[in-house]
Amino acid sequence: MARELRALLLWGRGLQSALRAPALAGVRRGKPVLHLQKTTVHFRDPTQSLASGISAGQLYSTQAAEDKKEEALHSIISNTEAVQGSVSKHEFQAETKKLLDIVARSLYSEKEVFIRELISNASDALEKLRHKRVCEGQVLPEMEIHLQTDAEKGTITIQDTGIGMTKEELVSNLGTIARSGSKAFLEALQHQAETSSRIIGQFGVGFYSAFMVADKVEVYSRPAAPESPGYQWLSDGSGVFEIAEASGVRPGTKIIIHLKSDCKDFANESRVQDVVTKYSNFVSFPLYLNGRRINTLQAIWMMDPKDISEFQHEEFYRYIAQAYDKPRFILHYKTDAPLNIRSIFYVPEMKPSMFDVSRELGSSVALYSRKVLIQTKATDILPKWLRFVRGVVDSEDIPLNLSRELLQESALIRKLRDVLQQRLIKFFIDQSKKDAEKYAKFFEDYGLFMREGIVTTAEQDIKEDIAKLLRYESSALPAGQLTSLSDYASRMQAGTRNIYYLCAPNRHLAEHSPYYEAMKQKQTEVLFCYEQFDELTLLHLREFDKKKLISVETDIVVDHYKEEKFEDTSPAGERLSEKETEELMAWMRNALGSRVTNVKVTFRLDTHPAMVTVLEMGAARHFLRMQQLAKTQEERAQLLQPTLEINPRHTLIKKLNQLREREPELAQLLVDQIYENAMIAAGLVDDPRAMVGRLNDLLVKALERH
């Protein structure tokens, strides 16, 4: 068993379709069968099943292992129908052969969806009958859908025990492509819309998808009312159909599809079972293929969250995500306002790979309408930054074009996307409050997606909502403890308008940065941002809760423009005099040339000899990183226009002042190195190897004195 599971795990990594992942979808001869696309894996020991339970109502239920006998076949499909009386011919009203060709060849991208459409219509008919019988207080008959394949005859048959159709209904429902039987039925029951809203969409359109694969379509239908006659509807899709009374017709509807020569694969049982497993596993009614029950999965997103076990969640997650880990977070979200939504979302336990982060694919969430699959990966219902989320969304309000495959990009879809995004953000915020340590690990693994969301989203209010999920270390908190922007804002002193941050590779470099040192005099809390894209993220965010996000590097430049004064309280003998400082700055401007725009004095620094200031340094730094070709020092200087600010109290600056006249060659080496050190501290030098030669010269000069 262990060896088989390991082999299965390795094979499963190559799966492509999210909804063709491991799912116990059927049983044969007492052994669970694991369907993986078109491959089946049989376990040698029937007692070693991946799921337990024997009732169809249980998730991933299998036949009891103890039952050694093969389950008896159950089918209602038989050739009892016979045409009697005259045949009447009708032309499609306003639906010509050309229009039929459009529906059959252009509307659907995959021919296999005709099975999904016909199953949906059968479910529709059963739902109508159930509603009618319940309202009338009558006993419900067997509510079933049956499919039968016949490879010799090249046919596939689908039959339901639903409400059936009269002769007039056959003409109106199947004679007009654009007519919706379900819609008309709902209009007649508007006062009971809540009960009737479960009916699955447009019957007429779905029915005509059969002509993608059919040379001829036979329909036998009989209303559920006693003594009602049955009828045959027959057409080859050429623009004309025939109707005749028929005997031997069971209540409900039976459709026989005579397949085209290039579509004979749909007369193969395994091919049909693959399609049903892909699209219709969650239909509410029992679904049989050649006498065997094939839809054994339960739509757990429609259940009460209290009734779903942890095991069921794990198995369902593995099914929809083609995964082998467990979900770290589970959100079961149900609402009827402002939209009808039944959904389950999972966040994988496994850390995303670089492929997961960089891939251009959209959502990994499947979209259903009343438990019928619409899209395996619905790219429009979640924003791209949430592509790490796995799950299912089921909504009766989703607008569909004639084909269920072509979702309209409408205001309703955008509303659904906004509602789901806000609910997921709220869920993550709640999780951060519930278990901060678990959330911190989640943010470490998935924080890059949130940063992407802020950078790629245009609306400021949505940016700020996503920003509530960001976490950073802070100068006001111990190392390792994270804080949010909301928590930072709550600690701000009255009248403070800015949230300050500093980007550095780690806390040690942040705390020893000349820019953080310059902020200490203000006694202001500073967020420490360590990730590569934090700076770009905060530049795009700009503000949070009406407070500006300011890099401490930018704040220093702004202070200079505002000509804020910082008093130097050190004794006169410990610093250069004002005259010496002015002369030194003039010499440094000349020595550094075009590499600097200006040289100034600063009293913000204590342990650092100098620092570089650039207006909008974060944006400039990001721009330099994005350049394909390395730039020379002169080109960088022209772009950055840096100002070098010197600390007149520092030993290096005082020694430089002494050396500039006594040993000009050594002084030049020293001022070049002070400048380069400041550029490195500012993160404006990607490759420091160019300065190695100068450092060697400085070491030689230092050793020559001994």
UniProtKB/Swiss-Prot annotation:
Tell me the residue numbers annotated for binding ATP.
121, 160, 173, 207, 404
GO cellular component, alphabetical, reads: cell periphery; mitochondrial inner membrane; mitochondrial intermembrane space; mitochondrial matrix; mitochondrion
Q: Where is the transit peptide?
A: 1-60
Entry keyword annotation includes ATP-binding: yes
Presence of keyword Hydrolase:
no
Highest taxon of source: Eukaryota
Keywords of the record, alphabetical order, are: Acetylation, ATP-binding, Chaperone, Membrane, Mitochondrion, Mitochondrion inner membrane, Nucleotide-binding, Phosphoprotein, Transit peptide
One Pfam family of this chain: HATPase_c_3
Q: Which residues carry this modification: Phosphothreonine?
A: 176, 496
Choose any GO biological process term that the UniProt entry carries and state it.
Answer: protein folding
**A molecular function GO annotation:** ATP-dependent protein folding chaperone
Q: According to its UniProt record, where is this protein located?
A: Mitochondrion; Mitochondrion inner membrane; Mitochondrion matrix
Q: Which HAMAP family match?
A: HSP90
Assembly, per entry: Binds to the intracellular domain of tumor necrosis factor type 1 receptor. Binds to RB1. Interacts with SRC. Interacts with SDHA.
To which protein family does this belong?
Belongs to the heat shock protein 90 family.
Q: What exactly does this protein do?
A: Chaperone that expresses an ATPase activity. Involved in maintaining mitochondrial function and polarization, downstream of PINK1 and mitochondrial complex I. Is a negative regulator of mitochondrial respiration able to modulate the balance between oxidative phosphorylation and aerobic glycolysis. The impact of TRAP1 on mitochondrial respiration is probably mediated by modulation of mitochondrial SRC and inhibition of SDHA.
Name recorded for this polypeptide = Heat shock protein 75 kDa, mitochondrial
What is the protein's species of origin?
Answer: Rattus norvegicus (Rat)
